[in-house]
C-alpha cells in the first residue's frame, strides 16, 4: 500500500506539472484565465512534490486534520475559484479583490498564529470523527470551522455569477465547474472523516481527475 501511495503522489505531481506547463504555453493573448489556472495547478505540483520527498525520506505525513493542512486546503480551494471568476468576469480580478476573497482565510491564519502565541496546543487527531467527542475545546472547533469553510468558495462563484459584473458567462459551464470542485471537496472530506490509506489514494486520483477535467473542459478559454 505504501508503494502504491508513493506512486500515486508521484503521478499526481507529474500530471499536474505537465498540465501547468501546457496551460502556460497555450495561453492566449489578453487572456489571463489560462495563466491563473496554470499558477493554481502549480501550487498542487508543489504540494505533491514536497509530500513525495517527505515520504521517500521516511517522514510521517502530517495528520490531515491538523490546523496547518486545513488552512492549506482552504487556500487551495480559494485559488481554484479565481479561474472561473476570471472567465465569468474578465478583468474583474485585481490584487485588492483577491485580497478581499482571501480575507476570511487571512483572518483564520491570524487567529491560528495568535492561538499558538497564547499557548494553545493542537491535539493530534487522525480524523474529524475522532475530534467530535472533544468539540468543546477551541482547538477542535476551530479545525471543524476550517473544515466547513472549505465549501464556502463554491458559494462565492455563484454570487459573482449572479451579479452584473460578468460579460462572458456560461451558465452550464459554471455549474459543471462548481460540481467538479464540489466532488473534489467531498473526496477530501472523506479523507478528513476517515483518514484511511485507501481514501487518501482515492482522493489523489479524484483530485487529479478533477483538475484535468477543469483544464480540458473549457479549452476555448
Predicted regions and their residues:
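Individual alpha-helical transmembrane segments in multi-pass integral membrane proteins
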Residues: 2-16, 32-46, 50-92, 97-114
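C-terminal ends of transmembrane helices
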Residues: 20-28, 81-88, 163-164
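Alpha-helical transmembrane segments of multi-pass integral membrane proteins
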Residues: 27-49, 101-103, 131-195, 203-210
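Juxtamembrane "helix-exit" motif on the non-cytosolic side of transmembrane helices
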Residues: 50-60, 114-127, 163, 187-198
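Membrane-anchoring/interfacial helices and their immediately flanking loops
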Residues: 93-147
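Conserved small/polar residues in nucleotide/adenosyl-binding loops
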Residues: 219-221
Amino acid at each position: 500500500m505504501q508503494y502504491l501511495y508513493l506512486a500515486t503522489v508521484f503521478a499526481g505531481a507529474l500530471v499536474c506539472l505537465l498540465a501547468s506547463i501546457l496551460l502556460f504555453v497555450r495561453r492566449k493573448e489578453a487572456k489571463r484565465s489560462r495563466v491563473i489556472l496554470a499558477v493554481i495547478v502549480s501550487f498542487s505540483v508543489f504540494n505533491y512534490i514536497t509530500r513525495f520527498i517527505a515520504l521517500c525520506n521516511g517522514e510521517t505525513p502530517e495528520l490531515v486534520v491538523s490546523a496547518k493542512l486545513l488552512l492549506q486546503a482552504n487556500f487551495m480551494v480559494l485559488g481554484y475559484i479565481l479561474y472561473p471568476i476570471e472567465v465569468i468576469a474578465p478583468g474583474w480580478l485585481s490584487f485588492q479583490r483577491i485580497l478581499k476573497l482571501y480575507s476570511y482565510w487571512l483572518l483564520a491564519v491570524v487567529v491560528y498564529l495568535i492561538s499558538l502565541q497564547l499557548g494553545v496546543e493542537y491535539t493530534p487527531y487522525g480524523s474529524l470523527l475522532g475530534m467530535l467527542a472533544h468539540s468543546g475545546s477551541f482547538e477542535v472547533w476551530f479545525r471543524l470551522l476550517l473544515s466547513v469553510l472549505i465549501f464556502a468558495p463554491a458559494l462565492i462563484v455563484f454570487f459573482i455569477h449572479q451579479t452584473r459584473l460578468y460579460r462572458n458567462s456560461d451558465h452550464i459551464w459554471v455549474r459543471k465547474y462548481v460540481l467538479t470542485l464540489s466532488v473534489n471537496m467531498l473526496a477530501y472530506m472523506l479523507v478528513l472523516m476517515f483518514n484511511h490509506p485507501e481514501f487518501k489514494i482515492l482522493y489523489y486520483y479524484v483530485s487529479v481527475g478533477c483538475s484535468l477535467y477543469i483544464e480540458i473542459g473549457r479549452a476555448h478559454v
